[in-house]
C-alpha cells in the first residue's frame, strides 16, 4: 500500500513540473492582402530558447515555420510560405512566441498549429485562420423589360467567403431571386442576382452581407410610377422624327464644338506642362545631398553606398538599434526643421513603393500604421498601377500622364507644402499642404520582394543631365502628332493641388 501511494505521489510531482502550450482561443481573422499574427505561449512560463518551435498547417509535417537549435530553419518550410513568415522571439525566454504571416490569400484559410518540444516532452495547440475579403458595392443595372416587367441585375465582386445576397422591397421585405456565383483566379467570389419587378415597385435594394465581418453593403434603385406609361404610336413616330433631326444637328454641332474645344484643351495642357516645368526648375535650385541611414533600415533592406536600397528575400543579421524600423522602411541621415529642400528618388520598375517624408519621432517599432499626416507621414504611394496619397480618413488617387519611375520631392517647411514631381515628363504630380512640426526626414518604404522584377530604389543626384534626360523622355512620351492623337491626350484628367 505504501509503495502504491509513493508511486502516485511521484507521478503527480512529475506532472506538476510539466508545461502546456496555449494558442489563440478563438479563430484568427485576417483580410486578403494583409498580415496575420499567431501567438503561442507556455504555461507556466518556461524558457523556450533551446526548444523546437514548429508552426504547421493542418498536420505536423506541413511546416509553416520551424525554429530549431536556436535559429530559424527556412529550408523546412512549404514553398507557399517561404519569404512570408517572421518569428518574433523577443519574449521566447519567457515562453512566448509569435509568428507573423504576410500577404494573406484565400488559400491560407484553414487549421494551424503550434508544437513546442523539449528533449523529453512536447505539447501543441490548434486554431483556425479565417480569411475574409469585403467585395465591391453592388452595381444595379436594368437589363430589359418583357411584358411590362423590368429585369434587374445586381453584380458585386471580390468577396470571400461567399456573401449572402438579397433583393429587398420598399418595406424591407425579402424578394425571391435567381443567383449565380463564380470564383476568379485568386479564389474570390463574384456574385450576380437577378430580379423581375412590375411597375409601381418603388424603392428596390440589393445587399451583400459578409457573415464573418458582420458587414453589409447595399445599393438602391427607384422604379417610378410612370416607367411603363403607354404612348400612342403617332406620338412615338413624332418623337422618333424629332430625335433623328436632333441627332443629326447634334452630331454636326458636336464636331464643330470639339474641334474648337480640342484646341483649347491642348493649349491648357501645354500651359500646365510649362507651369509644372517652371515649378520643377525652381525646386531644383534647392537640391540637397540626401544619404540613407543604414541603422534605421529594416533587416530585409540592404543599404549600399548610402544611396541605394535593395530588398532581400531573407533578413540580414543586423545589430539591434532603437532607430530601426519594423516596417520595411529606411530614412535619411539628414533632417529638416526649416527651409526649402529638394531631392530625387528612382523607384525603377518596382510595382510597390512609398516615397516622401516622416516626422523624426514616429513610432518605428509599430509595424502596422496608416501612412497619413495624422501619424506623421507625408508620402506618395505606388501599389501596382495605382498611385495615391493616404490622407486620413480618405485616399486621394492621382493619374499622371506618364507613369513615373523617378520622383522629385520638394519640401517647403515654412510654407507647409510638400510637392511631388514626375521627372519622366517634368510634370507636377501633387502638392500636399500641412502645418509641419518638429524634425522631418526623407522616407523610403520598399514593402515587397520580387525576385523577377524587383530593382533597387536609389537616391539620385540632381544634375543638368537628369533634366536633359527628362526633356528627352517627355518628348518621347508626348509627341506632336495628328489631331486624333492630340484628342486622346486631351482626355487625360488634370491633376489638382490638394489640401488636407
Swiss-Prot record:
GO MF assignments: signaling receptor binding
Predominant location: membrane
Stretches of the chain found on the membrane's Cytoplasmic side: 260-500
GO biological process, one term: T cell receptor signaling pathway
Induction, per UniProt: Down-regulated in neutrophils after treatment with LPS and TNF.
Cystine crosslinks: 40-114, 154-206
Domain Ig-like V-type: 19-132, 133-222
Ranges of compositional bias, category Polar residues: 479-492
Membrane-spanning segments: 239-259
Coiled coil location: none
Tissue specificity remark: Expressed in neutrophils. Isoforms 1 and 5 are expressed at high levels in the colon, lung,testis, lymph nodes and thyroid tissue. Isoform 5, but not isoform 1, is detected in spleen.
Family, per entry: Belongs to the immunoglobulin superfamily. BTN/MOG family.
Protein function: May stimulate primary immune response. Acts on T-cell stimulated sub-optimally through the TCR/CD3 complex stimulating their proliferation and cytokine production.
Listed name of the protein: Butyrophilin-like protein 8
Organism expressing this protein natively: Homo sapiens (Human)
Classification of source organism: Eukaryota, Metazoa, Chordata, Craniata, Vertebrata
Gene field: BTNL8
